[in-house]
């Protein structure tokens, strides 16, 4: 088994739910009611995404994202 590491983004929705997505895997996302469920669901979505790529003999993208928190003062 190969281990994959990906950055995920979790956004709180106006209705209180969460949208989670993996920028390195285009279209890989989930929307659920709570934070913990978002993390579990995006892990499952990533696994399914990678399995689909492999079953179609496609390359699995490498993580190529840099995240930096910046301060903007007005």
What are these regions (language model features)?
Residues 1-6, 40-74:
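Short, charged, surface-exposed hinge/linker loops at domain edges
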